[in-house]
Every structure is written in C-alpha cells, then in structure tokens.
Amino acid sequence: FKQSDENSQLIRQFLSELNSGKLSSGLLKISSLSKLASFLDCERFAIYDSRAIFSLNWLLFKYTNADLFFQPQGRNRELEIRNMNVLFHFSDIKPNYRKPDVSFHQYCGLLQYLAKQVYGEQAKPYRIEMLLFGIATTWICADMDQLIKFDCLRNQDFQTA
C-alpha cells in the first residue's frame, strides 16, 4: 500500500468489517486487502486474486450451476483476451453472480472446503488458491480455447472496457 489517508481509512474499514461476514462495496477492488486478511489468519482467509477467481469461475461455470464470484480487475493479457463477461454478453449464457458484500467470505469458505477435500483435513485454503492461480493461464486458458476461438484477438491491441 502507498501511505495515504485514503488507504489507511480503507484498511481500518476492511479490518473492522472482516469478521462480520460482509464487506462494504469497493473493498475488494484492492486485492492487497484480501492479502492482509490472509496474512492475519490463513486458516480462514485466502487472497481474492484475479487469476484464482478466473479459474474458479470457469470451473464453476463449466461443471456446476453455482453462482460465480465477482471478477477483480487483473493485468494478465491472456485472461483479458478471454474475458468471461464478454463471452456471456455475446451468448445466451446469463450466469448469476454472488452478492459483492458476501463474495469474499463465500470464496474463503469454498476454498476452505475444497482444500480439505483435495489435500486433507489440515489443509489451508491458500493451497487451493495457489492451485487456481497456477492453472489460470495454462489449463483454464487451454480449456477455454478448446471450446471458443480467441485466436483472432491474440495479435491485436485488445483492451477491455
């Protein structure tokens, strides 16, 4: 975080709301706030990272009927090219999204559950978060490419709105 009154206020607000199960609008626009939560209590909280959310949303979309998570802005070109909101916009697919105020806590709860299912009872949620992060630009992008052709966008100056 850059030292500023605004960032200090955001951190105080985030910490005061963290244990309530709900976060005010806009608090997850800064992934560093979820990093703070994960550092404070890695048993309960995971980093709400754009790559991890991207992977999780694709898996939820492809294999379940579960509501998707709010997708934070990222800086990865491969994920930008495969913007799921654009995909949904130009199709008949209209997914439901979780409410932003509870999305972070539901994400952390799901990662806690999945970590135990995949790695055993003592596993921490960050293990699943790192797995999701790691497969975003490899397995997830390749899986999407099998279903949808994104090659036309790869060599152009493509910017999402």
Predicted regions and their residues:
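Short, flexible loop/turn elements at secondary-structure junctions
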Residues: 1, 40-41, 132
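Long, highly charged, low-complexity intrinsically disordered interaction regions
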Residues: 1-22
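Generic structural hydrophobic/aromatic packing signal, biased to beta-strands
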Residues: 10-15, 36, 111, 128
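Helix-hairpin-helix
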Residues: 18-41
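Short, surface-exposed helix-loop/turn micro-motifs enriched in polar/charged residues
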Residues: 24-28, 44-48, 120, 124
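Catalytic Zn2+-binding segment of zinc metalloproteases
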Residues: 38-51, 59-64
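C-terminal accessory module of base-excision DNA glycosylases/AP lyases that mediates lesion recognition
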Residues: 50-54, 63-161
